[in-house]
Amino acid sequence: SAEDAMRLVDRSREPFLIRTALNTTCEMSDGKYFTRFAFMNDGSNGPGWWGEKNETTKETQHYQLNKWRILDKWVEKYKELDPDLLVTSSHATEHNLEMPFSVGNLKADAGRLYADFMTREYLNGTSHPRVYFAAGNCLIGNVDNDPNSMAVGWLSGMNATAMVGYVVTTWYGRNGWGGLKYWAANAGRLTLAQAIYLNQQDMLHTEFGWYPEMLTVDYPFSAGAFAEDSEFKKLFRQATGNLPTKDQKGFVHDRDVVVLYGDPAWDVKLKNPAPLGYKVDFKMKGKQCVVTIITNEYFDGALMKGGKLKQEHVTDIPFAYYFPTLLQSNVKFERSIGKSLRLRSNKR
């Protein structure tokens, strides 16, 4: 509605630091980015388990839980935490989120979400800014021109100020998990939109490195599940002269199918659990721009590469930096001196 749109705009006017979270993935289950936190494991076929952390416990405490009660626990902690951030990854469609798979269900109804218990339990929104990150769910970001869609429910009834999600079925996971990895690895430094954008640029750079022509190949979603593989191989071979690897197919599949709803200018960040291990200095010297990375005793090279978050979907990520001023497109890397990178360009 127009009211929902204005609320989204109003709540993204000021910077916001994520402090509380509710997570249904094994990733980030240590809760180190949050002051108060709870998670449920919704992807296991075995016994369920959950954990929580607060100002008193400091570290996440883990507990076993019958998987049939995971949704009950999620609803309980949702109401208790009123979380700034929600992260999910289990099976979903435009109209429901299974939590866990085939057992519990969140469903959408006219702009609201409800837990599908014996008696429906509708969930209330929040009075503060909120991010919903559907890192690995199929289809949940697809509004599908339907007021009963999950995306409308998250943005309206659950009052998400920003939402990230897939608009198609997902099997490769590079785009959704990659965005989360960039955001978490750069906690306190990158906003949500910056992380999503940099992950996209990383994917495009990787594709260009394989074959520049890959960037002209669009995944044939309209071919249908039974024909899309053969159709993609045909399109890929026509463009590159080669058959695709699984990774190349996955990159093209994922390239343009994750949506960020919300104001991309919103300054919303994760809280860094420790002092940032480096700072970046930028100077212009004539036609040279000098970027210097200065590390300190808190520096963690593994964290800069992504901290192994969802490594099976997203390998190590590179260091990324937003220049404070616009550079011309013909920037050339000149040389590295110690911890400095020297680029030659004319500043606009």
Where are these regions (language model features)?
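Cysteine-dependent hydrolase recognition
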Residues: 1-348
